[in-house]
Structure formats: C-alpha cells, structure tokens
C-alpha cells in the first residue's frame, strides 16, 4: 500500500481506491488514467533488423484497439512494447503524456493486466492463482471476480472448489478453464490497461463464448488492446489496426475498413489468411 510519512507525503507506489499511482524517476507521484500513445515508434529485436516501422497510435480509457494481421506482422511485438518488455530504437511511447522510460518498470507492469493464450498458472489453489491479481483480496472478492469472468460455475463444480490445488502450470485444467482463471485474475486487479490475446480455435465453442463474455466484462472503462485471431470478435472495436510487415497499413472502424476494400476487406471475406 501507499504509506504516508509524518509530513503527509506518499512514499510508495500502489493501488489507491481502485486508482493506480506511479512514482516517476523524478520522484513525482502520479495517478494513471490509461491514455497510451505511440509516436513514430521504430523497433527491432536486434539493431540491424527493424521489425516495427513508424508506428503511431493512441488509445484512451474506455477504448478498445484491435491489432489484426498475418503471423509475423507485428501484433505481439506492439503489445510487448506496451509492457516495456523492450526499449524502442526511435520515437516515443507515453502513458498520460509521460514518457514510458520515466516510469519504473515494476510500476508500469503492475498497472497492466494480460490475458494471453498460454496462461501461466502457479502451483497453489485456484483461489491463490486468482488472488495473484490482488494479493490482499478477500475470499468474497475472489469469488466475485470469478463470477465476472464466468469461471465460478466450473470452479464450484470441482470437489475442492476454490481450494483445488493446481500443479504443473494448471495442466489438470483445460486450456479454456485456465484462461477463465486468468480473466478472473485480471478482473480482481482492475488495472487501467488490459492486453488481451484471443483464445485459439482449439477451445470448445461453449467455453469460447464464456471467455468472450468474461473479456467483455473486464474491458469496461479501461484501455484495451486486443490481439485478434478472428475478425468476428473485433467488430465493436473503436479502432482496428491492420498490420503488415511491421507497418500499420490500414486503420479505422470495422465499417470504415470494409468500405475501403483493402487488406482488412480481404481478410474479412476470406481472401487473405489472418493467422
């Protein structure tokens, strides 16, 4: 928790009443709202080979930004930069107008939640795995988060319920069940920024619908970035970024992009392979 000194100043960075605060490298404390911007970003995993070229985009709280494109187009790389897993070669990434380089990495990543296909679960109970999103969460908060994520139903059917032990990265659960727990973890954390990597086609249709509903529930009011694998799920995005060879070649809403009859139109009508 953030603690007050005798003079009333705040000393640590943590969640305050649902808001996230950062201590900058300058020592200044700021609250994160979730305005994320890329300004002419250039990036390569090795300096000799650039994989993202002049990427510019912005996302505000309450907006959903979807990235679509073939394998290797740069979708995952952009989300890795949102997390600052890597530093960029040129350009700037800002959060609420603050250069990402001025934000401590631990503070930044605590302000983000990721729901990815290959969910990482820990050895421990299901409750512990959900609580990882908020370490001081009560049992009631954990169950409420699971309900939001549509995970409570399958958890409650397990013999030990929320006390069920998970081993070996949750291998006793299906891939869909693991992802529902990851959504519950994000729901309990209530971060300002979410990164969602859609479920793969290997998940059964019923679980896929539960995952989509859970994701929709945790998106509200947050800045959301989606790595899209099926275009049917991004139609309601505020903006869709079509990537090809590390460049944004088209951007706009679903209807706007269909009207352009460009690459998105080709993807949507099955003329070009998305994966």
Predicted regions and their residues:
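ABC-type nucleotide-binding domain
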Residues: 2-275
């Amino acid at each position: 928790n953030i603690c007050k000194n005798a003079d009333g100043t705040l000393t640590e960075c943590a969640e305050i009443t649902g808001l996230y605060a950062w201590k900058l490298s300058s020592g200044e404390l700021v609250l994160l709202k979730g305005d994320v911007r890329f300004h002419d970003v250039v990036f390569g995993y090795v300096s000799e080979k650039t994989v993202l070229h002049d990427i510019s985009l912005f996302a505000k709280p309450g907006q959903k930004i979807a990235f679509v494109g073939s394998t290797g187009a740069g979708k995952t790389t952009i989300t890795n930069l949102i997390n600052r897993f890597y530093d960029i070669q040129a350009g700037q990434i800002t959060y609420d107008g603050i250069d990402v380089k001025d934000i401590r990495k631990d503070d930044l990543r605590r302000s983000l939640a990721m729901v990815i296909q290959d969910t990482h679960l820990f050895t421990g109970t299901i409750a512990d795995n959900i609580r990882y999103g908020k370490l001081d969460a009560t049992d009631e908060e954990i169950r409420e988060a699971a309900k939001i994520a549509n995970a409570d139903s399958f958890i409650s059917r397990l013999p030990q319920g929320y006390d069920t032990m998970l081993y070996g990265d949750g291998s006793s659960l299906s891939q869909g069940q693991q992802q529902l727990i990851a959504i519950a973890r994000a729901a309990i954390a209530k971060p300002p920024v979410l990164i969602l990597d859609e479920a793969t086609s290997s998940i059964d249709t019923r679980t896929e619908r539960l995952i989509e509903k859970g994701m929709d529930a945790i998106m509200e009011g947050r800045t959301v970035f989606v790595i899209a694998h099926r275009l049917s799920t991004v139609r309601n995005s505020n903006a869709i970024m079509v990537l090809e060879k590390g460049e944004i070649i088209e951007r706009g809403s679903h209807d706007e992009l269909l009207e352009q009859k460009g690459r998105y139109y080709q993807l949507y009508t099955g003329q070009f392979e998305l994966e």
